[in-house]
Amino acid sequence: MPENISHDSETPAQEQQVITACAFIHHNFDGIEKVFLPKRADTKKFLPGVYELPGGHIDYGEDIIKGLKREIMEEFGMKATIGDPFATFTYLNKIKGSHSIEVIYFAKFDDSLENIVIHPEDHSRFEWIAENELGKAYTEYKRGDDPEMQAVKKGFSLLKGELLAFN
């Protein structure tokens, strides 16, 4: 990577489409389903200090599931089982100059939750957040109407077996 670029999310991709895979990693804590939401480091140029679903860019020619597993291992030192995709959305990344297509999958950690590692250049911390606590994850950059937060709400609805509306 060029010297002035510290992370792939800053690598220029002017007018290119980028595939991003993310995981709705959930766990049941004493009967309460929660989602794993790491908080991006404040030093990030794109969405600093924002809670997000774990994942990242899929490399050229890489299988999307293998790429998502790779991202989870790189960022948190954890193996994960990836389930079905349940949400997609697109956004423009003004830092990279790219058009991102995000695909969100259900997932579970395979390793003990005590083994989660946080790399400070990527994330400052993480939370396990229940559906009724999602307001804790909102920031000036990411509110309840944000597409990723809408996908998190959808994930909780699907876990509860609720039927979804169609557009």
Regions found by a protein language model. Give the residues of each.
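Short connector loops at helix/strand junctions that flank enzyme active sites
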Residues: 18, 48-53, 98-102
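Active-site-adjacent beta-strand/loop module that shapes the phosphate/pyrophosphate-binding cleft
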Residues: 89-115, 127
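Nudix hydrolase/Nudix homology domain
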Residues: 120-167
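Conserved Nudix-box catalytic region and its N-terminal flanking loop in Nudix hydrolases
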Residues: 32-74
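A short coil-to-beta-strand element that immediately follows conserved catalytic motifs
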Residues: 78-87
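A structural signal for short, well-ordered beta-strand segments
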Residues: 21-23, 85, 103-107
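Acidic, metal-coordinating catalytic segment for phosphate/diphosphate chemistry
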Residues: 1-30
